[in-house]
Amino acid sequence: MADDKDAWLAATVEQPIDADEEIVDPHHHLWDFPAGTYLVPELHEDTGAGHNVTQTVFVECAAGYHTSGPEHMRPVGETEFVREQAAISAESGGATISAIVSFADLTLGNAVEEVLAAHDAAGEGLFRGIRHANAWDGSDQIRESHTKPPPELLADPDFRAGYATLGRMGFSFDGWMFHTQVAELVDLAHAVPDTPVVLDHLGGPLGIGPYADRRDEVRAVVRPALEALARHPQVTVKVGGIGMSIYGVGFKRLPQAPSSEHVAATWSDDIRHCIETFGPDRCMFESNFPVDKQGCSYTVLFNAFQRICDEAGYTAAERADLFAGTARRFYRVGPPA
């Protein structure tokens, strides 16, 4: 099956539109699971395909957990695993993994401080924050996120105490949720304003199950929620996730992988609305690889982002924020060595 996917992707070949524009990719995963491997060699095959990707940020995916010890401390194994991968990336000459976003159960409340301190120690200067995904929908056709969250997790008092602890300790929160839940993040951002937060993947605009072929109705829900969220200055947005099949745009059903023109045409309105709502200084283009590899290649994805920027007429300074600057500021990523 992997060979079929590789052949499907390889059928669409593009050169970078701008091979010099610096990119800090603020969202990718790494894993070594029975179903597949995506480690530094695979990451560098993608980031080194033509665009100028200098640094990256790893985001949790339940990889490398400890298999023994207290349950709440086991996710620290992922930080240790990625720290080792980061060292390999620094030695191998490609994009350097320069920050780590891990998992901790924020419903531990104030007691999550122990887990955060352990992540920070394990990261050896790379740990930046936590993603505790809350993506949930009442439809049995929509699979919830890997954390198996209950509905309305962001309103849980214990969760909010853990979320506040993140900010108090100087760490950030990555929010992964569906479009129907973004309003819950608005409430959380209002109630606990001191924790920096980045909303992943354009706010999760679903396009399958009960949301299939209802894109305008989904927009009518998510866009006002994004506009309300943008009023909270501690909130930033990741612009990406657009290759995921749950968004229902049908890339996987094409006879060959889409071109950057196709990807840009499919997503330009939504991406430009997000950027215009938050401003380029609070938006960052992300790959979400290898998950988004189900939809297009890395080069096609970043060509699509560059096409959208060209179409919108963003200035050099605005583009610098979108492709690198916002990610550097939010995740406190210094310049490459």
Locate predicted features:
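Structural preference for beta-strand elements that scaffold enzyme active sites
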Residues: 22-25, 55-58, 94-101, 125-131, ...
